[in-house]
Amino acid sequence: MKTGDKALVDPKLTGLETWVEGKVIDIENNPFKGVVIAIEDKDGRIFFGEEKYFKAA
């Protein structure tokens, strides 16, 4: 996954009922959490978390 790709974020991270689709806006290698991904959805909401909560759309 790279910046600009479409991705889905797990409801376990968002607290919503369904997977949310968005565009990857940042990928960071966090020394404590590993790879952390941030996406922005069509409503302008930003979700970020560990790589395990994301999948390619």
Model-assigned labels for residue ranges:
Residues T3-A56:
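Basic/aromatic-rich interaction segments and small domains that mediate binding to polyanionic partners
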